[in-house]
A protein has these predicted regions:
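NAD(P)-dependent short-chain dehydrogenase/reductase
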Residues: 128, 151-215
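N-terminal Rossmann-like NAD(P)+-binding domain of SDR-like oxidoreductases, especially those catalyzing
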Residues: 1-176
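Aromatic-acidic/polar surface patches that form glycan- and anion
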Residues: 15, 215-216
């Protein structure tokens, strides 16, 4: 039987591409998404779609009961600006939502978790390109919630009281962009914002002196 993969946030532009690749490689996929930013139309028709929120433990439990072999956890609030406007929502979705995923993995003995973290956990590092070993020093609420989620997951993987092996991999992604990404969402990454400006014939607004740079 093909392995059953749960993709949270699978209706988003990253998650939908991950789902496509998994199905192409023969996996059975369930997409779990609240469609707050993702689009149902972008979900591969061969995937099982469940409308749900990672903050809803009851909905998550129902999905895990279908027999999940691994989880790719992409669902989350991804705007730094919104994290400052609504920090409690950022914490609830990014950190507590991830804890809910971890709890279900433990309850149902799901031994593989891949977590979509963020480069924001590094803050403003002095080294460019920034190596994975750079010290985490987030300077935004968003970065704090993603780093906290990482630590909960990786510490769980070291627990000696679990009766199964729990493997975790976190991906600290830098300004992801591509097909299916919204070009009208002002809270998306800088690439999408700039591309949207160009396609609409609008000026690209760069704040400060224009000399600032970052590791992409």
């Amino acid at each position: 039987m093909n392995k059953h993969i749960l993709v949270t946030g699978g209706a988003g532009f990253i998650g939908s591409h991950v789902t496509d690749l998994l199905i192409e490689r023969g996996y059975r996929v369930t997409v779990f998404d609240n469609e707050s930013t993702g689009k149902r139309a972008d979900v591969n028709p061969q995937a099982t779609f469940v409308h749900g929120d990672v903050r809803d433990e009851v909905a998550l439990e129902a999905v895990f009961k279908t027999g999940i072999n691994a989880v790719i956890h992409i669902a989350g609030q991804a705007s730094i600006r919104l994290s400052f406007m609504h920090p409690e929502a950022d914490l609830n979705v990014n950190t507590l939502g991830t804890i809910n995923i971890i709890k279900q993995c433990i309850a149902h003995r799901v031994g593989r978790l891949l977590f979509a973290s963020s480069m924001t956990i590094y803050g403003t590092p002095d080294i460019a390109p920034t190596p994975e070993t750079a010290f985490p020093a987030p300077v935004s609420y968003y970065g704090v919630t993603k780093y906290a989620a990482e630590r909960f997951a990786h510490i769980t993987a070291t627990r000696k009281d679990l009766d199964f092996e729990f493997n975790v991999t976190s991906f600290r992604m830098f300004n992801v962009y591509g097909e299916r990404q919204s070009l009208t969402n002002a809270y998306q990454g800088v690439f999408a914002i700039f591309m949207g400006n160009v396609l609409r014939g609008e000026p690209i607004n760069i704040h400060s002196d224009g000399e600032q740079s970052r590791d992409f």
